[in-house]
Amino acid sequence: MKKSSLNTITKDLKFVYSENKSISIVFHDNHTLSGVVGELNSNLKELEKLSGSNIYFRGNSIIIKGNQQKNEAVKRAIVFLTEQFKSNGSLEKKDIVSSLDTFMLEEQNKDNHQSLDYIIKT
């Protein structure tokens, strides 16, 4: 994602973190919101199914509830989907799958790394 376009996206979105570890994403543009949410919330339902988080849509906000790691992954996926929608004018199922796959794989790789206390040279 280009840095300039990311700045534009983050200006269009507002992130609100709650004490119960949920994240609310507020959209300022209803057209973008409807594109990201999808017809009959289909994109959010797919994202919810793939991520294992609970995703709610109300007004101009998307609310993500789950554990903190999954919430952040879904938040980044929604930012990615917003970028895709603004660039292409539409979203496909592959965009939804790839948005989460990219971030889930990164998180999985972070979890699999172990820190080394010693390095032995031979």
Region annotations inferred by a language model:
Residues 1-16:
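Acidic, low-complexity intrinsically disordered tails
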Residues 15-35:
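Short glycine-/aliphatic-rich beta-strand segments at the starts of folded cytosolic domains
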Residues 32-49:
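Short amphipathic alpha-helix segments
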Residues 43, 50, 80-84:
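Conserved short hydrophobic interaction patches
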Residues 49-51, 58:
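N-terminal assembly/transducer modules of large multi-domain enzymes
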Residues 56-119:
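Interdomain "pre-motor" coupling segment immediately N-terminal to P-loop NTPase/helicase cores
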Residues 122:
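Glycine-rich adenosyl-nucleotide cofactor-binding module
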